[in-house]
Structures are given as C-alpha cells and as structure tokens.
Amino acid sequence: MTATPSRPLTGRRVLVTRAAGQATTLSQELRQLGAAVVEIPAIAIQPVALPEDLRAAARSLRGHRPPRWMAVTSSNAVEALRALSLPEDLAGIRVAAVGEPTARALRDIGVNVELVAPGTGAGALADGLIGAGAGEGAVWLPQGEAARIELGERLGQAGADVAVTVCYRTVPVAGLRRLLIPALAERVDAVTLLSPSVVEAVIAAVGPDALCGLSLVCVGSTTAAALRRHRLTPVVASRGDAEGVAAAVAGALRR
C-alpha cells in the first residue's frame, strides 16, 4: 500500500514502548495514520506509597497556610492518587499538572486542575506555580522514585514549604531483550520512547547500536538528553499527547 496525506505512515512499522495499559491511545493514533504498531512495554509501574501515606500527606498540606498546591508531573502519579477520597481529601488544595495528558488523567479521577504547564518539563511547571504565588505557601509533590529534583528545589528557593511523597517506581520489564530483539529484526522504522526510564530500559536490553538508523521519537528535554547520552539522535515531539507524538513519528518518517 502507498502512503497518502491522510495516512502518511502506511507501510511503516512503529514500536511503542509505553508501560502496559498506557499505550492504547498512542497506538490508535498511529494506526489511524496507517502504521503497523508493535506494542512492547519496556517498563512496569510499581506503587510505593501506601494509601494512608497519601492521605496523611494531603492532610498535612491542608494544615499549611494558603496557597496550598499539589503539583503532579506524571500520569503514573495520578494512578497512585486514586487511593485518596476525592475530592474530599483535596479540599482547599489547588492542583497543577505538567502537560495536558497528566491534567486529563487527573480530571478523569475527579480532580479539578487549575494550572497546566505546557510541555513535559518541570521547569515550566515551576514557573507557573511561582507566578501563581506558590512561593508564599506550601506545595506537595507526589512523584516517582526517579523524578528530578529541579521542581522541588526551585519552589523551595522561591519560599514554598515543599513536601515530597514517592508514590511509584519504574522497573524494566522482565525478559525485555527477548521481546525486543525479534521485533527489531523484523524491521522497525520508528520507536517511541516517552521517558528516561524507558530509554534506559531499552538500551540496557539491546544496546544503543540496535537503535541506530531508526527514528527515535521522544517527549521533553529530559528524555531527549537520555538518548543523546547514548549518542543517539532524538526526534522531540512538540506536544506530549498521543496526537502530538504520532504527528512527530509521521514527520520524522516523511523526511
């Protein structure tokens, strides 16, 4: 079949490496553009914080002087927040998120999101929160074990009382090399790698040479930097949602 303007990925094969249960929307977008999609989760998400830990953190935040903010940088953290009694546990707490996908995940569990920072970087969220006066109050950061410290540091420097709860960790999927090698051997045109932990898991499994010559589509400067550390060239999507990533894949393979 020949690619058309509406289906530019016809005849192309794209490897999607998102965690199990998180690839559906992206895979649908890619298929709508004509791609043959191979889903191989590179990482698994493991909860760390107990529900009572999250409730205690929310209760502690409510005891601070306003403004009180909860800042969420990943949809993985949203899954952990399902343990809260919503919206009661977040009464009086303003909520900020990095990127529309994370904001959408929060809204899906009944959380009103007041501030959405563009892109995927913590820097933009820090700017938004500081601009909204968060430095005069308290900020709770429910986040992953490997989350960068930039957001908390900047908020603290601005005067905020910052509390961090590690609520999940990412781990490589067992037997990942055994899954990836045959998929890559069958010809892959592009790979989506949407977090540094995914990059490291894939590289540890097959090595950087296995990805040379492929379009490596990522989201955000942190993930792009992870690829560059392995001397790989990233294609950085301008938007972090599924439609934006799929468009970046199509753009990369059109060149």
What is each of the regions a protein language model found here?
Residues 1-255:
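Signature of uroporphyrinogen-III synthase
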